[in-house]
């Protein structure tokens, strides 16, 4: 069954947790959400020169990432959720190293992979999501579109989480995942058009 398009960002996140929290640590390790004042104080502390999109504020008002001592927790398929301090500190380190462009703020990570949101100087409701690894590229239209796509992957069985030896593993139907992500993110069609030869005979399911 497809997910409900009218869900709020927080409702989407809670529904994703219904799948990934088969690992008891997931809910236990989520940090309490931040107030708007706390969010703004952290932004100022790190001299972050951009305005956080509304959907990022909603994300961190929901929960402030996972506790720092446990990176095995998955908010969704194999990626963990950075605290706002971690996100801003990582952004600062990236700028010092010249690793990525300045207007990308990391939110989710796994072993050198990063999902980053594009930010602007002025307040925006949303921002496009970039995948940063060996190559950088836009992969989701917005944070909400990304999370909604992930939720629907769980809802239709394209992602099937399994708890094994105390860890969550996910069985993936790559064709279904590619179909769902393309349905809700127009930017993925642009990527497909650009790299048609690369994806020939394959499924654009990741990232």
Residue ranges, per PLM feature:
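A surface-exposed partner-binding patch
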Residues: 1-115, 186-207
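Long, low-complexity, intrinsically disordered segments enriched in glycines and aromatic residues
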Residues: 63-182
């Amino acid at each position: 069954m497809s997910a409900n398009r009218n869900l709020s960002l927080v409702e989407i996140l809670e529904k994703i947790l219904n799948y990934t929290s088969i690992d008891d640590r997931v809910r236990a390790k989520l940090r309490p959400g931040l107030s708007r004042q706390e969010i703004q104080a952290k932004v100022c502390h790190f001299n972050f020169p951009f305005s956080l999109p509304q959907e990022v504020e909603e994300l961190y008002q929901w929960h402030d990432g996972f506790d720092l001592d446990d990176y095995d927790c998955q908010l969704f398929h194999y990626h963990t959720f950075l605290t706002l301090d971690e996100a801003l500190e990582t952004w600062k380190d990236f700028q010092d190293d010249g690793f990525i462009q300045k207007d990308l703020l990391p939110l989710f990570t796994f072993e050198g992979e990063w999902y980053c949101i594009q930010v602007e100087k002025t307040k925006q409701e949303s921002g496009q999501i970039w995948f940063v690894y060996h190559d950088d590229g836009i992969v989701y239209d917005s944070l909400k579109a990304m999370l909604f796509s992930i939720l629907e992957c769980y809802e239709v069985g394209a992602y099937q989480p399994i708890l094994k030896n105390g860890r969550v593993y996910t069985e993936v139907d790559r064709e279904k995942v590619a179909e769902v992500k393309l349905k809700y993110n127009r930017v993925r069609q642009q990527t497909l058009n650009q790299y048609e030869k690369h994806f020939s005979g394959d499924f654009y399911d990741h990232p």
